[in-house]
Amino acid sequence: MSDGRGAEIALNRALWAVVNQRFTDAAANAMWALPEAVWGLFAVPERSLGVLGDVRGRDVAELACGTAYVSAWLASAGARPVALDLSREQLATARRLQHAVGPAFPLVQADAEQLPLASGCVDLVVSEHGVAAWCDPARWLPEAARVLRPGGRLVFLTNSHLSALCVPADEGVAGERLLRGHREAYRVHWEGGGVEYHPSHGDWVRLLRAAGFVVEALHELFAPAGGGDHPFYEIVTREWATRWPAEELWVATRA
């Protein structure tokens, strides 16, 4: 890509190869074994949110799927998912779990900003801590709208805008001070590698509307009582996330 986005994508792909080696490959075993869908760093159960609806018989695209545990849950619930991710390593992990425990569904190495899917081919587009943070929203949202059928649903989870303002630039978890300006979090190039996008609420509404979506809900996720910090991702502590939202779960409908 002539605008430099290609270099950012390559950087993110390299980062996730390392993350898969250090954490997500081993963690996938437990995620695929969970009896129900959960959301985010602190495993908020889908039954308490109800954002996916009845997925039986639905065609689903999971964008930036990682090790595809969301698609595994969806397939077990009767959906027909296709899971897409840029990371060859994470897809290999997903393939390993498919062979070991099932269920089987298509795994596709692809960029969510340029989906290799036909227009109007799915009823649901979903992403759990994937596409919203690691892809340019001005590019992936129109693609999500393109592949959705009219009235189809988009559900995506990302870090809260507040946490993105409070996470240190070098390392460590979010604190109680704002470390960057409100608009500076839209695109963040972390010193440790990787480029993320954290639009504000106003930005998300504008971007979703421009892509042809109607916003249905925004769920701000806090950490449930009890338990410890996430074993790998240094974003927020559980204590922080009991006071302020750690993540945002957006639900929108294609007009």
Report each predicted region and the residues it spans:
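Conserved class I S-adenosyl-L-methionine
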Residues: 153-186
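A short acidic, Gly/Pro-enriched loop at the edge of an enzyme's catalytic core
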Residues: 113-124
